[in-house]
Amino acid sequence: MSHLVKMENGQSQTIQEMLGCIERYNPDHLKILESYVQDQAKNNTYDLEANLAVLKLYQFNPHMLNFDITYTILLKCLTNLPHTDFVMAKCLLLPQQMKDENVQTIIDLADILERADFTLFWQRAEVNRTMFRHISGFHDSIRKFVSHVVGITFQTIKKDLLKELLGGIEDSTLESWIKRNGWKHQGQDLVVVATQDDKIKTKNITEKIEFENVGALMAQCI
């Protein structure tokens, strides 16, 4: 859905154009930006700059604060881990937002993800599932982050453990994630995440530089 922002001169701009000028701080545009946040949740899209602009407008206009939009923005930030979007959004929260019980729950979920305690995350997510049921693709976005962590942590992993880390998924769903990440089966119980050849090999390179090679350059610096 296209969102156009009407300026005082009667002309219209896209949200991206509006965010590039001083109009981003105009509270008259907040409702359109909030609607844009809701569309991101519905359509599994993401615009960090617009979402941070909403939180900034709340800072300047605390009487316009919308907690439901705040929750959605924070949860959308979680879907973009391992990027630091959540940290940036958290830094823009007002004291009354930080004291909110649901905000604290989301912060706790973020902390759990950051320390890669994925089993606990899925347990907490199940308890609080109504909080993000309106966010399309939320679970798969988290699984994408889990896959990233698994990919840089393991060479091989037991299938049962991998299923648990990905949220207790079924075998058929596991197969799709194995294929998506380019992993392979090893026997009945193991999944090969990375072979030794896939690991980046570092090499120390020492180059011998003779004085004559830099003499002319040093002379120019004197």
Curated annotation (Swiss-Prot):
Cellular component, GO, one term:
eukaryotic translation initiation factor 3 complex
Q: Could you tell me which residue ranges the PCI domain spans?
A: 46-208
Q: Which residues form the signal peptide?
A: none
One of its GO biological process terms is: formation of cytoplasmic translation initiation complex
> Which locations, inside or outside the cell, does it occupy?
Cytoplasm
Say which domain of life the source belongs to. Eukaryota
Which InterPro entries does the UniProt record give? ARM-type_fold, CSN8_PSD8_EIF3K, eIF3k, PCI_dom, Transl_init_fac_sub12_N_euk, WH-like_DNA-bd_sf, WH_DNA-bd_sf
Keywords of the record, alphabetical order, are: Cytoplasm, Initiation factor, Protein biosynthesis
Instruction: Read off the SUPFAM superfamilies from this record.
Output: ARM repeat, Winged helix' DNA-binding domain
Coarse class of the primary localization is cytoplasm
Tagged with keyword Cytoplasm:
yes
What Pfam families is this protein classified in?
A: CSN8_PSD8_EIF3K
Output one GO MF annotation: ribosome binding
Q: What does this protein do?
A: Component of the eukaryotic translation initiation factor 3 (eIF-3) complex, which is involved in protein synthesis of a specialized repertoire of mRNAs and, together with other initiation factors, stimulates binding of mRNA and methionyl-tRNAi to the 40S ribosome. The eIF-3 complex specifically targets and initiates translation of a subset of mRNAs involved in cell proliferation.
Q: Which family does it belong to?
A: Belongs to the eIF-3 subunit K family.
The entry describes its oligomerization and partners as: Component of the eukaryotic translation initiation factor 3 (eIF-3) complex. The eIF-3 complex interacts with pix.
Q: Which PANTHER family match?
A: EUKARYOTIC TRANSLATION INITIATION FACTOR 3 SUBUNIT 11 (PTHR13022), EUKARYOTIC TRANSLATION INITIATION FACTOR 3 SUBUNIT K (PTHR13022:SF0)
Query: What protein name does the entry list?
Result: Eukaryotic translation initiation factor 3 subunit K
